[in-house]
A protein has these predicted regions:
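Glycine/charged-rich beta-loop-alpha catalytic/anionic-binding loops adjacent to active sites
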Residues: 50, 82-87, 108-119, 168-175, ...
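Short beta-strand segments
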Residues: 9-12, 120, 145-151, 192
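Flexible, glycine-rich active-site loops centered on histidine and acidic residues
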Residues: 138-180
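Phosphate/pyrophosphate-binding loops at sites that engage ATP/ADP/AMP, CoA/4′-phosphopantetheine
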Residues: 68-84, 243-245
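Acidic-glycine-rich active-site phosphate/pyrophosphate-binding loop
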Residues: 36-43, 95-109, 156-168, 215-219
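Condensing-enzyme catalytic core mediating Claisen C-C bond formation in acyl metabolism
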Residues: 1-57, 169-239, 243
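Conserved catalytic cysteine-centered active-site region
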Residues: 40-46, 50-63, 91-144
Length: 245
């Protein structure tokens, strides 16, 4: 679907304050690397990642999303009362219940008429949130929407390192949990609105989606552990990207 009446009012982000280098992680994993014969520059060589960001202390996904949302709302010039929907798209969440969106909604003091809910779809969730909100704006249901995301990778990074340092951890364990140590922390938020109300906004014309859900088992994770078939995920992901574009 192509949109004719949707524009981006603002986009903002929050960087987690602490830089955690790949070298630091590998140094902590040195006993396991030596035991399994794994080189210590694997992150840079395989993933191209030299560092990632983490929070300083106990920052929840809703905390992070709220900080980004406050910046985005201020940059947009839109009043809190004008926002008709809040969609949280974080992979991480504060709790199974209530929704992280409801916590962010309360933190921001949005109107009780503002819909709020979580949308979970891994790293594509933010785009899905944009699309859901844009359809509502296009139909005239609402005038403005707020899409947020807040991620906290501290817990999964620490738990993964702890598991890989166990004497019984194997090379297969390392390969399956390697991707968990590439994750970082941060937050982002976007305000969308009717283009007629945002003469200086950037048009949002639409999106394209394709699915290959027969491969959904290639990466499975929860808050403290993620297991990934990295090679197959890359190969099949590239095939899907080629089919899409």
């Amino acid at each position: 679907m192509l949109y004719k009446h949707v524009a981006i009012a603002s986009v903002n982000h929050i960087e987690a304050p602490i830089r955690l280098s790949s070298a630091e992680i590998m140094q902590r994993l040195a006993p396991t690397l030596e035991r399994l014969g794994i080189r210590d520059n694997l992150f840079e060589d395989v993933a191209g990642i030299t560092a990632r960001r983490i929070w300083d202390g106990p920052v929840t996904p809703s905390d992070a999303a709220t900080m980004a949302a406050q910046k985005a709302i201020a940059a947009s010039g839109i009043s809190h009362e004008a926002i008709g929907i809040l969609v949280n798209t974080s992979v991480c969440r504060d709790y199974l219940e209530p929704s992280t969106a409801s916590i962010v909604h309360g933190n921001l003091g949005l109107a009780d008429t503002c819909q709020n809910f979580d949308v979970g779809n891994a790293c594509l969730g933010f785009l899905n949130g944009m699309d859901i909100a844009a359809r509502m704006i296009e139909r005239g249901d609402i005038e403005y929407a707020l899409i947020v995301n807040g991620e906290a990778s501290n817990l999964i990074a620490e738990r993964t390192i702890e598991r890989l340092l166990r004497p019984e951890s194997s090379a297969e364990d390392f390969r399956s949990e390697f991707a968990s140590l590439t994750l970082g922390s941060g937050a982002a938020a976007m305000v969308l609105g009717r283009s007629e109300l945002l003469p200086n906004g950037h048009p949002f014309l639409g999106s394209v989606t394709r699915a290959a859900t027969q491969f959904s088992h290639l990466c499975r994770g929860n808050m403290d552990r993620m297991v990934t078939d990295t090679r197959t995920l890359l190969v099949e992901g590239l095939k899907l990207a080629a089919k899409t574009f």
